[in-house]
Amino acid sequence: MSTPEATAEAVSGHEPNRAVRARFCPSPTGTPHVGLVRTALYNWVFARHNQGKLVFRIEDTDASRDSEESYQALLDALRWLGLDWDEGPEVGGEYGPYRQSERRDIYADIARRLLEAGELYESFSTPEEVEARHRAAGRDPKLGYDNADRDLTDEQKAAFRAEGRNAVLRLRMPEHDITFADLVRGEITFPAGSVPDPVLVRGNGDALYTLTNPVDDALMRITHVLRGEDLLSSTPRQIALYDALRRIGVTDFTPEFGHLPFVMGEGNKKLSKRDPQSNLFHHRDRGFLPEGLLNYLALLGWSISEDRDVFTLDEMVEAFEIGRVSSNPARFDQKKADAINSAHLRALAPDDFLERVVPYLVSGGVLPAEPTEEQLATVRAAAPLVQERLIVLSDAVGMMRFLFDGDDFAPDPASAEKALGEDARPVLEAAVSALEALPEWTTEAIEAALKESVVDGLGIKPRKAFAPVRVAVTGRTVSPPLYESMELLGREVSLRRLRAPLG
């Protein structure tokens, strides 16, 4: 395979005036991962940018690996992310059905027509026989299929069947170079003879991905195939199959292909499905916003501009160009993902933030399943104090728990050990004395009283002076702004918590 710079010649049958039809076609196996979501996002944005359509198709022909649970997880993931589709499961469309398990008759018919036209041929060689032929010829036995069955006679086929062998169906690859203009990588050439004739149909009649994927793309009139770099090696086989499908009248064009860069994990290794950060729902459960996660995943191969990392999905749709996607591997950086999400959290309107944070406070045990109006009012009042400090929504559980703990309140043991030792006693006593005398319980009054009594009165630097007060009142060394938090808690609760460590 060679990849010279892109030339003016685009080896594709796509016409500029043909309406864009992109597709997202995962297999329902395991849990949706960020690489899969990045592919879905790029296809969705590409379709929307070009006023085209996105087809959602389920490639579920492997009964040993596919599951209904994984299928539902895919639907759940796309709904949570807000990536809708124009055709596919639960939506329908003129080219359905959109689950491959419901299209077996279609594949059987196409395979029959390709076989009758001589585009496919029956192959009986076993892997052991192929390796033996390579060894006998002094070649590497791992070279793969050697195209030896291309011209079997009817008598030879009958003899194999008499032995009880079932034929697989292979595509007859062309004897010339296959060149195409990759939308991401430029012009790519696979030399003649570098790709063995692939199996399209198993001996038991089951169609393989090598047949079903291009056939569905052809029948569904897909114009652009944007997918992971790991599928680049399958492209010459698919282009050859498209040529065959054109010759038998199934389609009249070949889509354009674009292969997206790998997503790497720590240590420059490809991000594994076993890595926690690969799991989409891990990020959702932590409290990522859909728009925050999509923004970060967009950056794994593309950028809106050199000096800007934070943007909305609408802004991405407006600016997206597939030709600006990088071909270089992208590394998943959790810290940067967190920073992007935090920026989106800060941008939320107050009511929007409240609606999103309450479920995390409920699941974290801070609020009951049915919060009271008084509890919601407290969250609403505290929201401006915590929203600026959150990385993910679940951080609100630790930051806001102190507002609702009531008689069960107790400082975090590690924080108490650090800030509520014997040397904290003078600070707490001074704070209680000053605050008891306050005529008004306001943020400004609390701040002035504490600074006068502790900082000025005891001669202690503010950072050290207020650590015992913060831990006694909020239970943590890191909390929302102290004076505002005490105003929210009220005089009685604040003073009770300040007195508790004094015994």
Curated annotation (Swiss-Prot):
SUPFAM superfamilies: An anticodon-binding domain of class I aminoacyl-tRNA synthetases (SSF48163), Nucleotidylyl transferase (SSF52374)
Biased composition (Basic and acidic residues): 130-148
Motif ('HIGH' region): 26-36
Binding, ATP: K273
An annotated GO cellular component: cytosol
Chief localization: cytoplasm
Keywords carried by this UniProt record: Aminoacyl-tRNA synthetase, ATP-binding, Cytoplasm, Ligase, Nucleotide-binding, Protein biosynthesis
A Pfam family this chain is assigned to: Anticodon_2
GO molecular function: ATP binding; glutamate-tRNA ligase activity; tRNA binding; zinc ion binding
Motif ('KMSKS' region): 270-274
Summary of the function given for this chain in its UniProt record: Catalyzes the attachment of glutamate to tRNA(Glu) in a two-step reaction: glutamate is first activated by ATP to form Glu-AMP and then transferred to the acceptor end of tRNA(Glu).
UniProt cross-references to NCBIfam families, sorted A to Z: gltX_bact (TIGR00464)
Family under the similarity heading: Belongs to the class-I aminoacyl-tRNA synthetase family. Glutamate--tRNA ligase type 1 subfamily.
Protein name as catalogued: Glutamate--tRNA ligase
Species this chain originates from: Saccharopolyspora erythraea (strain ATCC 11635 / DSM 40517 / JCM 4748 / NBRC 13426 / NCIMB 8594 / NRRL 2338)
Phylogenetic lineage: Bacteria, Bacillati, Actinomycetota, Actinomycetes, Pseudonocardiales
